[in-house]
Amino acid sequence: MPIQFEHVTHIYGEGTPMAYTALHDLELSFTEGKMTAIIGQTGSGKSTLVQHLNALLLPTKGTVYVLDRKIEAGSRPKGLKSLRGDVGLVFQFPEYQLFEETVLKDVSFGPKNFGASEEEAIAKAEKALQLVGFDKALYQRSPLELSGGQKRRVAIAGILAMDPKILVLDEPTAGLDPQGTVEMMSLFARLNKIGTTVLVVSHDMEQVFRYCDEVVVMADGKCRLHTSVKEFFRDGSICESLGIVPPAIVQMKDGLKAKGFHIDDDIVDIEALADCIARQVKKHE
């Protein structure tokens, strides 16, 4: 079953003078097996949306379907513990959630909490730490002694150790340096290639363009647009209509097309664009 929101409304502080509607009659389906970006202005409902996927928030009205679970307004969903194992949610700055004495204990905590033996939990933790490129020499180090980037890797490994079927990422590269950003996004893309559905909240259009398959645009608690990345960035016009600055490479492609170059819509990096231009220049020499 796809991930589906049916007429979902979420109101913070319902019935109080401070009531605020974050999601308004939301109708939206996510494609399983894809890497989908969720974008929109601050306050558009992005973070509220993703917290419904593992029932951290429940709908005020409507129904959310995730895998084989049904999350309804007014009722506690069945199989809540297993749902939170299947849907891994990585918050912005997840490193603030680290608490164990050592890195290995922290990452193995989740699997043990879900019934894995000590040996199984350690094996899952080590596999997850290897996935995020964490130095084995630091496994017995206190998480509090690590750098910011190292803490981020440990926190994400803690989610991956649960073997989630769906990985939900809320600004996962915030605060990382360029190299760390590329490494993390490449990891998420690899996980997606082997079958994990990945949903990523992002404001970085360069990341969306390079790594994602689909784009969901949120505005005023509703889905304003859901389309493929290829269509969304085809010529920059959709971005401009939404007040979004297109990625630099999309702007370059548009400029080159205006000069008469034939640029393939599938080109997503500077190297491929340079090769395309070089071939056309050489052809006309």
Q: What residue spans do the PLM features occupy?
A:
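Conserved ABC ATPase "signature" C-loop
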Residues: D220-G221
